[in-house]
């Protein structure tokens, strides 16, 4: 049976090919247009009435080139001016007393081939971290079409300034033909709002916080000075980190609200709750700034607000220094004291981690225990069923062994 096949319609294929060719032609035209626009067109014009003059005291070797970003050049030897852009960069190389100084400056916007006289500034107005002292030699290149004032730097001296540039002052002396720029930092004291407290050495003090704050979580912080209290932060070297070693001032949590009874922590004997911090057996090293940090959430991270207290511990007036400390520390050597401090720090850190991640850990623990119980139940069920299937059943006495013999009957074969 012959089947007539319908002739294939090539209109779709031709349309696809036409579209591809159209996009290719447009793309090539765009690329050619871009290449044409990006090409540099340089027009040279010879000026007949060009005069060059400069001030005296030029160095032994002098060369000046004015160069724009796309190749605009003004040469004093061939009297040829070619310019197509409007951004001027002045560069000069000067040899004076057998020493070479290279200086580069970026000038302001300049329209070439204009009828007005344009001056390019010598110094930028940006703040820099050095003082510049220079001698100016001005060279004017004048023509009937344009006029440009360029400057050449003979000597540049850099004086580093250790302070950060905040306020800058520029001074120019026209008589000595010099200019200087000096930037200095205004160093001020950052004041923190705090409550001033005073106590005597050997006494106890209670720092009372604002009880009207609604704080889900409170942590008491102490702000240490590394030069005087650095050995109290991480006394054991194996716990020291570069982050704390290179800090002059650092904050450290000293008490959580669950410490209700007096306990030793570094050089402090303290107890606290959400509103009060009690420090016992004060000494002069306990002076400093303390903060009651109120966290808006239950974890010790995120937005918080501090209530600051400045504590000053004055030396005792009497000579009786023998007092019974409320927080005795039964350690004999400095290493044992360091280990005790590390144990206290690790204990508080572990309690903090246990509280902050309690919900995540409990959820994972429940899931793990549930899967373990399911696996144990499946294993027990498997072994119990095998034991039941292998149970031996005794045979009846009325059944003889001959009934189990299978006889072969060849006549039944096909």
UniProtKB/Swiss-Prot annotation:
Its main location: virion. The chain crosses the membrane at residues 367-384. It is a single-pass membrane protein. GO terms for cellular component: membrane; viral envelope; virion membrane. It is found in: Virion membrane. Keywords: Membrane, Transmembrane, Transmembrane helix, Viral envelope protein, Virion. This is Uncharacterized protein RL12. It comes from Human cytomegalovirus (strain Merlin) (HHV-5). The lineage of its organism: Viruses, Duplodnaviria, Heunggongvirae, Peploviricota, Herviviricetes. The gene is RL12.
């Amino acid at each position: 049976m012959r089947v007539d096949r319908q002739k294939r319609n090539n209109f779709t294929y031709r349309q696809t090919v036409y579209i591809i060719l159209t996009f290719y032609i447009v793309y090539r035209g765009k690329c050619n247009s871009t290449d044409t626009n990006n090409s540099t067109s340089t027009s040279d014009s010879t000026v007949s009435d060009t005069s060059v003059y400069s001030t005296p005291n030029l160095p032994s070797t002098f060369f000046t080139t004015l160069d724009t970003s796309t190749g605009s050049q003004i040469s004093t030897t061939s009297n040829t001016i070619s310019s197509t852009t409007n951004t001027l960069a002045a560069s000069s190389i000067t040899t004076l007393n057998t020493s070479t100084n290279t200086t580069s400056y970026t000038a302001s916007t300049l329209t070439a081939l204009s009828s007005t006289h344009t001056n390019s500034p010598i110094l930028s107005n940006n703040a820099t971290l050095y003082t510049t002292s220079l001698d100016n030699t001005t060279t004017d290149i004048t023509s009937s079409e344009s006029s440009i004032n360029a400057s050449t730097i003979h000597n540049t001296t850099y004086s580093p300034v250790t302070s950060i540039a905040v306020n800058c002052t520029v001074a120019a002396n026209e008589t000595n033909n010099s200019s200087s720029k000096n930037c200095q930092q205004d160093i001020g004291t950052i004041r923190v709002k705090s409550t001033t407290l005073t106590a005597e050495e050997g006494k106890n003090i209670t720092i009372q916080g604002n009880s009207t704050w609604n704080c889900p979580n409170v942590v008491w912080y102490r702000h240490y000075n590394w030069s005087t209290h650095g050995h109290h932060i991480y006394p054991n070297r194996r716990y020291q980190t570069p982050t704390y070693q290179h800090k002059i001032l650092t904050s450290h949590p000293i008490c959580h609200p669950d410490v209700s009874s007096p306990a030793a922590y570094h050089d402090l004997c303290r107890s606290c709750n959400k509103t009060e911090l009690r420090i016992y057996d004060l000494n002069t090293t306990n002076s400093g700034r303390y903060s009651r940090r109120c966290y808006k959430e239950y974890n010790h991270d995120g937005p918080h607000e501090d209530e600051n207290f400045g504590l000053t511990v004055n030396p005792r007036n009497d000579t009786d220094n023998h007092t019974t400390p409320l927080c005795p520390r039964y350690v004999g050597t400095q290493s044992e004291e360091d280990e005790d401090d590390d144990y206290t720090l690790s204990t508080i850190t572990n309690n903090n981690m246990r509280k902050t991640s309690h919900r995540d850990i409990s959820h994972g623990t429940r899931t793990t225990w549930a899967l373990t119980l399911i696996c144990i139940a499946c294993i027990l069920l498997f072994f119990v069923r095998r034991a039941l299937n292998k149970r031996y059943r005794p045979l009846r006495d009325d059944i003889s062994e001959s009934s189990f013999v299978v006889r072969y009957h060849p006549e039944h074969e096909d």
